[in-house]
């Protein structure tokens, strides 16, 4: 029989009051409206004129853009964090959907800025990047320029941005909701998917086995739907990559990570060429666990003494103390 040890965190929920008091907080709507108005004003002031800006003027523009984005980021993060605590609350989901749509509208107002920076002549861009006034944003400017071969025209970028609301982001949210709704029946108790997954780290092998079987059973219903959602997200990315002209499916990620396709491929080759290391590791782990052969539910089994149980209050003090 699986027993869940109380930690003191059973009724603990995120305190999001540093962002907003609630979904009805008037400050939330004020911030959204301010962001919308500021984005429109930003476009009115700078659209078509980025190439004419001095280093100081470009710094002012970047700072204003950061201010606009930081205000809206606070609102959208609040909505997502609040929704993550209860994905069955339709009101919370509606707030996420509304702000996601508003975010796309704001992005279409601001996206010209990056496009015009990317379009600067190399000599002018290099001079701006080298200026002391833009030292803080030097890496960001170089990153924007690095993506120059893969950006589309502004009308095309606007279409992709607005379509993303009903495209990738919508499918991604649906997948999270489907996964979050899964309940696992373990030893007569119904628990959440994440809690059930945590049982796979138990030192009790029989509990790991029962948990694994229960998780497999719970994942059965809706499997085809989740697979379809996942595949749709993958296809959406492949279309985006094709339109932008990326060489491989991972090229955009490599570029964002400041690395190259060649470097990542070398890493992949090094790992796949030494699968024997993983085999040796699991052989050793089986021996340390006193087993002739590992089962799939033994992969995350702890080694050594039983894991230390830490109460919520102690864990909270430990983490907060680390940031003091």
Where in the sequence are the language-model features?
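A well-structured
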Residues: 1-323
